[in-house]
UniProtKB/Swiss-Prot annotation:
EC number of the protein: 7.1.1.-
Keywords, sorted A to Z: 4Fe-4S, Iron, Iron-sulfur, Membrane, Metal-binding, NAD, NADP, Plastoquinone, Quinone, Thylakoid, Translocase, Transport
Listed cofactors: [4Fe-4S] cluster
HAMAP family per the UniProt record, alphabetical: NDH1_NuoB (MF_01356)
GO annotation, cellular component aspect: plasma membrane-derived thylakoid membrane; respiratory chain complex I
A biological process term (GO) from this entry: electron transport coupled proton transport
Amino acids binding [4Fe-4S] cluster: C63, C64, C128, C159
A GO molecular function held by the record: iron ion binding
Topology of this chain in the membrane: Peripheral membrane protein
Cofactor note: Binds 1 [4Fe-4S] cluster.
Oligomeric and partner information: NDH-1 can be composed of about 15 different subunits; different subcomplexes with different compositions have been identified which probably have different functions.
Protein name: NAD(P)H-quinone oxidoreductase subunit K
InterPro entries registered for this protein in UniProt: NADH_UbQ_OxRdtase-like_20kDa (IPR006137), NADH_UQ_OxRdtase_20Kd_su (IPR006138)
Length: 247
């Protein structure tokens, strides 16, 4: 007579349950127990908590912020990423610069960044924030890149970038946070940006605007051709010099 496999399996399961309830011998890790245990490290647990609750400080100065404001609505719903907008830099660990950074707003941006607790991250959103955009050629007040002021972790090119691009930047930032360690955060690391850290060979030239424009020879005495063309009278101090030139 062949044994019943179903009855043997139920007997084994009953025996395992009795050992768990009253272990007379050295216990073994059963399948039920292994499925309810999570093995991790302090770094992974800490990074998981931080990347799941990034609190951004919204710094919108131009039209790129309109695209970011679309994320707050129900269509995109950026709350599902754990992003909670904060109005105080002391409660935020992420600042998103959306729009043109001007010389007047640069000190305020740097101060907000310095007031944020460590570790902190920066996302540069839009062409105007990254390189100055359409204001980079002739504007006298636009900063040519926010990374001249604060270190940037993720760049989002576009004019303006779509909300989907912002989600992609958030995902890339979450991957960066997940790879960090507590030992790296405990040491003070100097963050450099592309301009000050790149060696270059530049020739120093004398300034063009020295404030002595009125002291130039052409301003002290108008050229002869100019006086003759517009019919100016020759100053008495230059009359003798004119006579010498004509002789």
């Amino acid at each position: 007579m062949s044994p019943n496999p179903t009855s043997d399996l139920s007997a084994i399961e009953q025996l395992q349950k009795e050992k768990i309830l009253n272990p007379a011998a050295r216990g073994q890790v059963t399948q039920d127990l292994s499925e309810n245990i999570i093995l991790t490290t302090v770094d992974d647990l800490h990074n998981w908590a931080r990347l799941s609750s990034l609190w951004p400080l919204l710094y919108g100065t131009a039209c790129c912020f309109i695209e970011f404001a679309a994320l707050i609505g129900s269509r995109f719903d950026f709350d599902r990423f754990g992003l909670v907008p904060r109005s105080s830099p002391r409660q935020a660990d992420l600042i998103i610069t959306a729009g043109t950074i001007t010389m007047k707003m640069a000190p305020a941006l740097v101060r907000l960044y310095e007031e944020m607790p460590d570790p902190k991250y920066v996302i540069a959103m839009g062409a105007c924030t990254i390189t100055g955009g359409m204001f980079s050629s002739d504007s006298t007040t636009a900063v040519r890149g926010v990374d001249k002021l604060i270190p940037v972790d993720v760049y989002i090119p576009g004019c303006p970038p779509r909300p989907e691009a912002i989600f992609d930047a958030i995902i890339k930032l979450r991957k960066k946070v997940s790879n960090e360690t507590i030992q790296e955060r405990s040491t003070v690391m100097e963050q450099t940006h592309r301009y000050y850290s790149t060696p270059h060979n530049m020739k120093a030239v004398s300034p063009i605007l020295t404030g002595k424009y009125l002291a130039t020879p052409t301003r002290q005495a108008p050229p002869k051709e100019l006086t003759e063309a517009i019919g100016m009278e020759v100053p008495p101090a230059l009359a003798s010099q004119k006579q010498k030139e004509e002789a």
